Amino acid sequence: MATPRLFKLKSQVAPALSGPVATDLPYARVYVDTGVFHLDSPYDYEVPEKLTHVVLTGVRVQVPFGNREVEGLVIERVVAPQVTNGLKTITKVLSIHPVATAKSLELIAQCAQRWATNPWDVIRSAIPPRVAAVDKTFQPSSSRVAKSNSQSDICFRAFEPHLSAHEQVTSIALESIRKGSVLIVAPDERDIVAICAQLERSAQPYLRIDSALSRNDRYANFLEATQEKNQIVIGSRSAIFAPLAPGATVIVFKESSPDLYEVRSPAWNARDVAMMRKSIDSARVILCGYVPSLDVAALIDSKRIAYFNSNAKISVKAFTPVDASLLPGRIFTDIRSNISQGPVLFVLPRKGYANGILCAHCKNVALCSCGGRLHLTSKNADPACRICGALSKQWKCSFCTRDKKFVVSRGIERAQEEIARAFPNTPIVLSFGDVIKDRVEAKPCIVLATPGAIPQVVGGYSAVVVLEGLSYFSHDDLRANERANELFFEVAGS
């Protein structure tokens, strides 16, 4: 027989007394992480007298909400609350360092209204997670910004196609830092690293804010950015919300890049947020890239955005492929002459080995049982479905039952085989997918890369070959044309 347990009374937990309410501005308006989408309004809380000196605008606090304790962000201190009955008291201050200014909180509110979302969804992207160890050691600076850019305009600067985009955006930043602080928003880590390297060559200090850093470094740099000093801040798309000094310059690098769109709800994009900062922060906004996006092009046509470009000519040769061959016969002489001078870049649209398979006998498309097309990730790999990922180890044509495959829509690995046969004894470097090369040596070789994975080389490439050029325009979306034009001009500056 089981031994009965002793009966224990459940103790009642009473809330601790918070003490008297502050005499000066006794209430705080707070954004609360409710976890409920439609509860998106700020809430008023009483401020205890013992916390009155640390409950400031932009400070993280812990507040009671329902039957639990949640995080909140102080918007402002007020004299009278919106609702007088049933007010609760701020439990404690999580961090004494403000992580938002009145202007950045206004920006968060406008973004939440524009994209119809809970403000905390924007705060989650705008402010890095708190690190207690950094909070304890961070020392706020007593000096504030001394310069302010008097211009508050917005423009698009088209890069020159024969020059590196990273060098050109660095030049714009160094020109703007003389007039006030600068924020550079770049699409991805590779662009951030390249721009940081250019700033270091110019002996220009900067603050970096992106997810590639450790949590400690990212949070420490973010706190330093809130000090509103004359400095260059660079980061990925979330850095667009970093607090800025009045009259700062915001530079959106490659503004047409899809990486500048937030993948989580509410799917804001850095370009539109930067344009909102023009009116909120009196910021000067510079959108830059080789080709404006369709959105910016419409604003340029309507004269709402100024457009600046410079005339430049680059040597371009077009070759028509014959019989679906990868390399036209007339291109070999140009490639051989340029290989002797340095690395030659080949840009291909697809990774893998073959993006499509046909039956070699009846030429019907090889399909998975789910209806998806089969492809080859490497030469000796089994056909895999592009939709469900299932492998077809014993594939046979569903029409003629034969098993001989004919590969179409070549990927970078199959292109490597053909180029290696065309240029024997020439070193070939691959950069795509999970094997991206950041740099290659400036010596005779062939570099095969997919868009977005092009390695840098000191002095640039001796020649750039864009293979299957028309395929870049054949994507089934309206932005295919703008992406293709941006890519062609970008590789020209490589």
Q: What is each of the regions a protein language model found here?
A:
Residues 1-320, 337-340, 345, 455-458, ...:
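Accessory, non-ATPase domains that flank or precede helicase/AAA+ motor cores in DNA-metabolism machines
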Residues 20, 97-101, 162-166, 185-189, ...:
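Conserved phosphate/pyrophosphate-binding and hydrolysis machinery centered on Walker-type P-loop NTPases
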Residues 184-185, 233-234, 286-288, 347, ...:
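Short, hydrophobic beta-strand segments that form beta-sheet elements in well-ordered domains
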Residues 193-198, 407-434:
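Short, charged N-terminal beta->alpha structural module
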Residues 213-228, 425-450:
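Conserved helicase ATPase core of P-loop NTP-dependent helicases/translocases
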Residues 315-332:
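C-terminal boundary of histidine-terminating zinc-finger modules
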Residues 340-422:
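Cys/His-rich short segments
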Residues 468-494:
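Conserved RecA-like P-loop NTPase helicase motor core
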